[in-house]
Design a protein with these regions (language model features):
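Aromatic- and Gly/Pro-enriched helix-to-coil junctions and flexible linker segments
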Residues: 27-188
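Sec-dependent bacterial lipoprotein signal peptides
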Residues: 1-26
Length: 188
């Protein structure tokens, strides 16, 4: 056996062993960029939905706290920057929800049930009740916050239109109860 063939065989065997070992631990080690391959709703359409969720569900005694499985970050509750107060009125010192907070809330929601979320999105958002957060908000499962939305109302349409890939921003604004702030640009 030539030296080049021996080296190639050893490298190939080592690669196979390494690959098998990586497969064995792949579930316990997150990828370096923490991304997983699932179908998910369009994040660029999420800010109006996030504003509604922050207003309705993101108070510090509900989903605006770190200990919850579904955490909401935004100007009305939990902030990523500890120097930001949970207050949206920019005219009185409040600060709008940041792009990083929209992203954190998006990841929290999409990551709750990634396989189910992928199934709902692949189906064009036709079966939103497969998702626990929709069932709880509709009062179909126990929820400390009670029933929050009714199928077909503006609050429900805000969420389900986003899941279907075409966010109804009018429904989100109506559900919020006041005009939304423009989404701030991401910083450098």
């Amino acid at each position: 056996m030539s030296r080049g063939v021996l080296v190639a065989a050893l490298v190939g065997s080592f690669g196979a062993l390494l690959g098998a070992g990586a497969a064995a631990v792949s579930c316990s080690i997150a990828p370096s960029d923490s991304r997983i391959g699932i179908a998910a709703p369009d994040e660029s359409q999420f800010p109006p939905v996030s504003d509604f969720l922050d207003h309705r569900c993101g108070t510090l005694d509900c989903h605006g706290q770190v200990g919850r499985n579904f955490r909401i970050w935004g100007c009305e509750g939990m902030r990523l920057d500890p120097n930001d107060v949970p207050y949206c009125n920019r005219n009185q010192g409040g600060k709008s929800t940041t792009p990083a907070e929209y992203n954190a809330t998006y990841r929290s929601l999409v990551g709750l049930e990634p396989t189910v979320m992928s199934q709902v999105i692949a189906g064009g958002g036709q079966d939103p009740e497969l998702l626990t957060f929709v069932r709880k908000a509709r009062g179909l499962e126990s929820h400390k916050g009670g029933t929050l939305i009714t199928p077909g109302d503006d609050q429900d349409n805000c969420i389900t239109s986003w899941l279907a890939g075409k966010t109804d921003t009018t429904a989100c604004t109506n559900a919020l109860g006041y005009p939304m702030f423009p989404v701030p640009e991401a910083g450098p």
